């Protein structure tokens, strides 16, 4: 069997993207890094996004950290998801930065969250810390769009959280708010502050926040599609 090669340009169809992702299934991160001419770090402490970057290279992703999807021409977002030996997610999944100001007129249909989750290529990767990074294997990909029920619940969560932001209740939001979607601080250090709306409508400084999918959502999604018991 010939070895796979990284795509040198963005895939032109979903079929091409999925076929390339399927070729990576079963390879270790170390093998894929070596084939792409990259060095595998010892761990992810200083390279938290390394797995995502590696797979973006292999799949010809174009967006980088821009607000558009990773495969903008296809409207597809790439999400790697670390899983345990039973295929269950080990952590929540970052979706996008939460906008804390300038939210008048924003709706679920026009939100960054919905745009990012409209069509997702999920790639599970072994994530247990007992497995050295280079030895962790890539799993089978899943090209997914939310069904009606998932979209409804995500919308309800988003609307609840955005209402709290707009009404100046940002400091009251905890990770427990939302059934599937949560908002958490997203900052490497506590000095990286951003503007938000305070309880009396005044401008305040607070930690940047991000939208994350809770593990109960991604766990059910993977179980349904991969028939995990």
UniProtKB/Swiss-Prot annotation:
GO terms for cellular component: cytoplasm. It holds the Pfam family MutH. Gene3D superfamilies: DNA mismatch repair MutH/Restriction endonuclease, type II. The keyword Chaperone does not apply. GO terms for biological process: DNA modification; mismatch repair. CDD domains: MutH-like (cd00583). Its main location: cytoplasm. It is found in: Cytoplasm. GO terms for molecular function: DNA binding; endonuclease activity. The keyword Ligase does not apply. This is DNA mismatch repair protein MutH. Belongs to the MutH family.
């Amino acid at each position: 069997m010939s070895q796979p090669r990284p795509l040198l340009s963005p895939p032109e169809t979903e079929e091409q993207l999925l076929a390339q992702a399927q070729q990576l299934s079963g390879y270790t991160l170390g093998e894929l890094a070596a084939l792409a001419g990259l060095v595998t770090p010892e761990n992810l402490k200083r390279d938290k996004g390394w797995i995502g970057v590696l797979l973006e290279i292999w799949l010809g992703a174009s967006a980088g950290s821009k607000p558009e999807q990773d495969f903008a021409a296809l409207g597809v977002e790439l999400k790697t998801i670390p899983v345990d030996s039973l295929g269950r997610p080990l952590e929540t999944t970052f979706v996008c930065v939460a906008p804390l100001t300038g939210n008048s007129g924003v709706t679920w249909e026009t939100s960054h969250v919905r745009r990012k989750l409209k069509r997702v290529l999920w790639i599970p990767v072994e994530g247990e810390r007992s497995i050295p990074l280079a030895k962790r294997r890539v799993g089978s990909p899943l090209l997914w769009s939310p069904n009606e029920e998932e979209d409804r619940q995500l919308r309800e969560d988003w609307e609840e959280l955005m209402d709290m932001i707009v009404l100046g209740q940002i400091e009251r939001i905890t990770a427990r708010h939302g059934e599937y979607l949560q908002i958490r601080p997203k900052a490497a250090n506590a000095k990286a502050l951003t503007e938000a709306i305070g309880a009396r409508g005044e401008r305040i400084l607070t930690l940047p926040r991000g939208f994350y999918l809770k593990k109960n959502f991604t766990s059910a999604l993977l179980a349904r599609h991969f028939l995990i018991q």
